[in-house]
Structures are given as C-alpha cells and as structure tokens.
Amino acid sequence: MPPEVVRGREWHGRGVSLFAWTNEPDDSRQPPLLTEHDGRIIGLNGHLADPADVTRLPDDSAGGCFSAWIARDGELSASTAINRVCPVFHAETPDLHVAGSRALLVHLAARDDDRVEHDVLALQTMVRQGFFLSDETPYKGVSALRPSSRLLVRDGARTITETPLPQAAPMPTSARRKRAAIGELADALLATVEPLRDLGEPVNLALTGGRDTRVLAALLHAARVPFRVTTNGLDTHPDVIIARVIAARLGVEHTVIAPPQTAAKDAVLVEHPLSRAWETLRTCEGMTSAYETIVSYLPYSGKPTMSGQSGETLRAGSLNLLQTDLGDKALRRRIETTFGKDAKLFTAEANEHAQELARPWLARTDRLEALDHLYIWYKVGRWQASARAGSLRRGDPVRPFLDNRVVRAALSLDQSWRLSEEVIYTLILRLAPKLRDVPIEGKPWRFAANQAPALFRRRLPEHLPTARTAGGWSWRTSPGPALTDLLRDQVLGSLDALTPIVNPDEVRALFAAPVVAKPALAWHLYTVSTLLTGLYPGKQPEGLPRITVSRPDPAR
C-alpha cells in the first residue's frame, strides 16, 4: 500500500519497544492504535466485539478477531486468540526477542544484516498444500505462535504458555439440552454483531443460497442490525433465486450483480505469473501460493461488510466435511494424506519431516476432533491468516465465524453433531423462523439425507442443485501450453534451490506434458521457487507481457 496512507505510534520503556502501524485513517474505530491502562501499553491487531475489553487483555473470553500486544518496563507479551487468524510471529537471538504480526519483518528485525535466510525444509508443506501445516514459516528462526497462546518476555527471559482447544461435550440426548447448547452458540454469535446496530449505516452481507451466509442473515435479523444483501449471478442462478426469497422474508434490500454478458471466449489474457507471484509473496510473505487469487489493494474503507468465510467452523471444519466415510481408517487416511500428499515428488527428508508433523495428530484417538482442530490450527490459523492479508488492506470486515467466543462455543459442541448440520439448521430457525421452508442450494441438509425418517424429510425445505455453468472453465485449472511453459521454465530453471525438498526427476515428469496435469501443484512449486530465488523482497517486475491462455476445447 502507498506509504502515505500508513500511520504509526511507538512506545519505548526499559528494555522494551512497541511499534504499531495501520492504514486506518484515524482512531475513530476503537480501541486506538495503542492504549495505556494501569501502567501497561496495549496494542491490538484486529478488532474486539466490545472495544472496552482492551483493558482486560489478554483474556480468553474476549470477543472479536484479534491478537494482543502488551508492554511495560522490562516486559513484553503477545497473545493469540483461539484460531490465531490474527497471527503472532516470533524469533529469538542471543541479544534480542522479537515478536510481530508480519513474519518477514520479525526475521529482518532479528538479524544483524538485511539478508533473508529461508527455512527450505519448512517449505515442503507449501509445495504440497499451498499453505503451512505447521508452526513454521519460510524464514529461518521465525515461528508462528500457536492458537490460544501467550508469549511473555520478562527481563530477557521468554516463556510460552498455551491453552488447549476446548474438548467437545457429548451430543445432547434430549431436545431441551440441544436447545440449551445451541443457545450458547447463538448468544456468542449475537454478541459479535450487536455493536453494529449503532453504526449509522447498514451492513452489506454477501448472500448466497448456501448455509453459512444464511446463518449470518438470520443472525443480523435476530440482532436487529440494519443490513442489506448483495448476490452475484444471473437471475436464473440458485444463489440469486434463494437469496431473493431470503431478502423478501426478512424485509431487507437485495441487490443482484449480474456478471458481464460477453461473447464466449476461446482464450483469455492473464497476468504474467511472475507479477502474480511477486504480489502474493509481498502480501502473504511466502505463506500462500500464487495459485490463490489475493485481493488487490484499494484505499481503506470503514464500511461494514460481511461474508460467510470460515462458516465450516460451525460444521466441524472443511476436512471433516470432505469425508463420506467416517470410519476410523478413512479418517486416519485423511490426516495422513493432508500432511503427506504427493509423497513421490518429495525427498526422503521432506517426507520424514511431514510424517513428524503428522505424528501428534495421528496419535489422537478421536479422529473427528483431530480433523476439526486441524482445520482451526492450519486451514484458518495459517491459510486464512495469510491469504486475508490482501483484503485487510481494504478494510476489516466483520467475521462472526472467526470470533474468539464463537469459535470456542462451536468447538465445545460434539463434532458429529455439528457435522450433521443439525446445529446450524436449528440455529437458523432459532434466529429467523421465517426462513424455515426456504430451499438450500447444493446438497440436502446432511442430517436429513443421512438420518431423518422419510416423514420428517418431507417437512424440510427442498434443495436446489448447484448450477453448472455451461462451458465454464478457469485458466488456473486449465493453464494451457503458454502459461505451462512459463511455470515450467521457472521451476526447472531453479531446481537446485528446490532439491533439498523435491526429487528433480519427479518434478521434470510433472511438467513433461505440454499442459501440466496438476496446475495447483505447479503453482505451489512456482511460488516456492520464486521465493527461494529472491523475487521478493525485491523490485516489482516491470514490462512483463500478459499471457494468452486458450480454452482446452473451444468447441465445447
């Protein structure tokens, strides 16, 4: 972002300095950049549901999406919330302890020179998955603080304490107990949005026909928060059809943004992959693959927005949702493949490292809980924490599903119960009974399809199958020969940098065809290759041509 939009504050005490920067134009969004209370200087990364809670930090019961930094003479602490989506990175040298919200900054601040030293072995997980399945970072000596953890440096000595994620209670056996359990989750959700009542302008909710944004529409309705909804798509798309019904039932304004209607294209012009990689490395610091589309910079806006990001938390996490077989062997295999994907591509050392990272998760006897917590630790706490850096330059959207109290309440509910989707179905009806018979987009409710008797299923709303866009294709998943050539040239041209973690012959085989068969893996390799060969930090590439990517089958 332009340096002129960044402002900062700093505090210096005995043996401790605290620096804070933001692109928010002023402190109208409370709490301010730094808060002084009871002899402590408190900094906040993210937001609190109740800004007054800043004086209670660190506190596991605080609502919001945040990490906290507290300084006084001779003492510094940094703490994460339950999902660490606002991260804390830390490093230690013989003379210095450094903690910060940006990993590369921590790395450079801890060094005597300005040279970047990478942790190549740690990057094996970036190549496999496009994000980190560990507490490692791309930078030597820099680690991510775990969820619900506190780093404390007092008079030069560092300690780290960690609060385990909540253990889920057994599934309630009576309707009364189910209502009570879901009531606690509903109360936590309501607390996240109640402060939005007094903003003076409505919240803009991106509404689809699916589950997660419906929870949010019901939530805003129940909390009496003024809001309007926006849906992207054609009038015939299930998202638009269902969102229109929801908006009418709840009495809110609904705007449909139709995609541009252009003639079918047999090819598209796309950004040069080196430019894409540079922006991804700059924004996400080598912890997100350039395969992902990172939100570009726009001037900061304080307008309240909301989407269904991370709604899988209420449904036992995306890793469990991928499963059709919930047997022990199948769930164990999901953990193994999550950490050990594409094993043939990697060196023995890289595979051993992946197995070491998987070991504590495989040791858990409750597989559903393990996959549920894996989602929080890594899919939210590393992938989303990194990828959302782009959108945070534009503003700080309200994310109820990332709220510290909401996540804690959700994790306290039985995983199989959440996975059945009965929890969110009941939650929607509790918050907005008017939505009882509104169809759902995609597959039927899981508990209805798998468990409910036929008579009960007939009382549930119908589902509308996910629309298939005729002739739809993506240049990322069908990169074509020209883009494949560029990915191949970069990766094969820098194999020496990658050989500590990958087998060169397997990499060559991956790129042997004119069009790479595993484009996501190719992009992950490309991202790590450009990182290790010094693309960033460095000057932004200039004068690179756009690339023509042809549709695989123009006649289709």
Predicted features by range, described:
Residues 1-264, 556:
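Cysteine-centered catalytic environments shared across enzyme families
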Residues 53-56, 103-105, 121-122, 177-184, ...:
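Exposed alpha-helical structural elements
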Residues 53-55, 63-65, 134-138, 288-298, ...:
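Short alpha-helical segments and helix-capping/turn motifs at coil-helix boundaries
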Residues 115-123, 362-373, 419, 509-525, ...:
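Structural motif
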Residues 136-143, 392, 422-425, 439-444, ...:
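Short coil/turn segments at secondary-structure boundaries
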Residues 150, 372-387:
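Core structural elements
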Residues 155, 167-368, 383-437, 449, ...:
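ATP-dependent adenylate-handling active sites, centered on carboxylate activation for C-N bond formation
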Residues 434-515:
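PAPS-dependent sulfotransferase catalytic core
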